[in-house]
């Protein structure tokens, strides 16, 4: 431990890795602008669609709302990061703003992953165990789980708020939320982020969708076309999480391991700098993929959003009250907004028959947002 602290002091005093910040001037700003242009309006519409589901007492809407909120918070940080990269990785907005926007930026990566995991588990319970876990899949439970997710990720990622996050390099650039070589506490935090923030939720998602596919294959009442759609959607979710987040966490883990082996070695940092920044930028594509995957590929939700936009345009043209929007554009039986049946009231009359019918309804109507209206 003493030698590690000595290495940290030596690195702080004598070592500043010669990373090429010029490579960030075009790719990251361009990508972030695209994410803002596409991600902000689509997440706003996804947030509205999720709110409509919550009004229908659908617990899935809670997770989707939180996912959209996390994406929108992430997007609000991008303008300052665009400015940062345009100025060759030079933060000009002070220590407080660096801490705040860096904290929001990185925390919401893991909040998004966590809520994608919650959605996966919720869909697994809806498809594979619609009766057994009916009481668990409620709005109150979803609210409690959401609060736990936010609290856990905020606490787990709060360490940078208590450290200086502005660092000068040898070219007088002011780095924000990055130091080359990294600090020991950052390496430890990166290990937590990689294994518990990314790999653990992704493993749960893989297990959940494996269970979904197994349940779908064993359900004779689901049409062949619907089964294929469910499988495509499940695979799309896994691939999006893999493509958006896995490259970044591979390099994050690589950098951290290299540092722990040789704390003051700049060779690895300099070689990985460009690729690391590219993979970090690619995580932003999740903000575009989330609303597309969970809302706009779905016929019912897409129809709702189209009706809402048409109604909104009509209100502006005719000058009517905006309140008419709330009652004029809800497709109650979209795959996202189907109300769960009251299992226990109907079972009183004919338990066996109604259990079978409810099971069929759940499997047909609640299979990963993909049942046709």
From Swiss-Prot:
Consequence the record notes for mutating residue 290 to A: Induces a shift of the optimal pH for activation
Transmembrane segments: 17-53, 58-88, 94-129, 138-164, 181-218, 223-258, 269-297
Membrane-topology annotation of the record: Multi-pass membrane protein
First-listed, main subcellular location of the protein, grouped into a coarse class: membrane
GO molecular-function term, one example from the UniProt record: G protein-coupled receptor activity
UniProt site (Proton sensing): 163, 173, 277
Control of this protein's activity: Activated by a network of residues that connects an extracellular-facing cavity to Glu-153, a conserved charged residue buried in the transmembrane core of the receptor. Protonation likely drives conformational changes in extracellular loop 2 (ECL2), which stabilizes movement of transmembrane 3 (TM3) and a series of rearrangements that connect the extracellular-facing cavity to Glu-153, a residue only conserved in proton-sensing G-protein coupled receptors.
Sites annotated Required for activation: 153
Listed result of changing residue 123 to A: Decreased proton-induced G-protein coupled receptor activity and ability to mediate activation of adenylate cyclase activity
Sequence ranges on the Cytoplasmic membrane side: 54-57, 130-137, 219-222, 298-373
SUPFAM superfamilies tied to this protein: Family A G protein-coupled receptor-like
Cysteines engaged in disulfide bonds, as pairs: 17-266, 98-176
Sites where a glycan is attached: 12, 172
Record topology, Extracellular segments: 1-16, 89-93, 165-180, 259-268
Family: Belongs to the G-protein coupled receptor 1 family.
Name used for this protein in its record: G-protein coupled receptor 4
Gene label: gpr4
């Amino acid at each position: 431990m003493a030698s590690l602290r000595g290495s940290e002091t030596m690195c702080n005093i004598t070592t500043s890795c010669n990373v090429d910040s010029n490579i960030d001037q075009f790719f990251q700003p361009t990508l972030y602008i695209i994410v803002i242009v596409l991600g902000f309006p689509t997440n706003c519409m996804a947030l509205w669609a999720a709110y409509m589901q919550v009004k229908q007492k659908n617990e899935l809407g809670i997770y989707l709302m939180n996912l959209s909120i996390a994406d929108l918070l992430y997007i609000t940080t991008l303008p300052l990061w665009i400015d940062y990269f345009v100025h060759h990785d030079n933060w000009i907005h002070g220590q407080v703003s660096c801490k705040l926007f860096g904290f929001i930026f990185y925390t919401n990566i893991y909040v998004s992953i966590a809520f994608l995991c919650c959605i996966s588990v919720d869909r697994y319970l809806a498809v594979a165990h619609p009766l057994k876990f009916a009481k668990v899949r409620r709005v109150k439970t979803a609210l409690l789980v959401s609060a736990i997710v936010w609290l856990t990720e905020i606490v787990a990622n709060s360490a940078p708020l208590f450290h200086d996050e502005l660092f000068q390099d040898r070219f007088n650039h002011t780095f924000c939320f990055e130091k080359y070589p990294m600090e020991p506490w950052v390496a430890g935090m990166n290990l937590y982020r990689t294994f518990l923030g990314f790999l653990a939720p992704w493993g749960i998602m893989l297990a959940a969708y494996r269970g979904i596919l197994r349940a779908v294959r064993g359900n004779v009442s689901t049409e062949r076309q619907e089964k294929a759609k469910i499988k495509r959607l499940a695979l799309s979710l896994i691939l999006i999480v893999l493509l958006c987040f896995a490259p970044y966490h591979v390099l994050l883990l690589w950098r951290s391991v290299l540092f722990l082996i040789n704390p003051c070695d700049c060779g690895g940092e300099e070689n990985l700098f460009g690729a690391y920044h590219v993979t970090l930028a690619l995580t932003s594509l999740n903000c575009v993929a989330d609303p597309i995957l969970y809302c706009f590929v779905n016929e019912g939700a897409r129809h709702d959003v189209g009706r809402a936009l048409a109604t909104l345009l009509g209100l502006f043209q005719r000058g009517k009250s905006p309140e008419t929007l709330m009652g004029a554009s809800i497709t109650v039986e979209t795959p996202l907004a189907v109300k769960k049946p009251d299992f226990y009231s109907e079972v009183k009359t004919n338990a066996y028959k109604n259990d079978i019918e409810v099971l069929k309804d759940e499997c047909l109507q609640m299979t990963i947002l993909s049942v046709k209206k």
